[in-house]
């Protein structure tokens, strides 16, 4: 009986760790994506960091990833950049992998 309870606790701990890691990867991805978009819009320094935080916050609005993609596409188009949702999604996936690698190396 004890071994079953131990296994259950181990499973719950692993699940919690995996969920926290996924959250961190998503947050890192959104920050990197926001900084990429900020650069394309000509933002630098504190303005670029602030935009990165806006993108990060968009994840918590209804729609999640779609909201992030829509925000970046709309903001880039508003600044005169020619970009498609597919291009931004490609960058989103690229930064997800980059964020995951960064976190695994920390």
Enumerate the predicted regions with their spans.
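A charge-rich, low-complexity, intrinsically flexible signal that marks solvent-exposed coils, linkers
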Residues: 1-106
């Amino acid at each position: 009986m004890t071994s079953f309870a131990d296994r259950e606790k181990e499973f719950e701990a692993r699940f919690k760790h995996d969920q926290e890691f996924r959250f961190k990867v998503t947050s890192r991805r959104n920050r990197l994506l926001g900084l990429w978009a900020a650069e394309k819009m000509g933002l630098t320094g504190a303005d670029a960091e602030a935009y990165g935080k806006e993108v990060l916050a968009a994840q918590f609005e209804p729609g999640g990833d779609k909201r992030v993609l829509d925000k970046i596409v709309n903001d880039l188009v508003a600044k005169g950049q020619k970009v498609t949702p597919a291009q931004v999604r490609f960058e989103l996936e690229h930064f997800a992998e980059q964020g995951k690698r960064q976190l695994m190396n920390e």
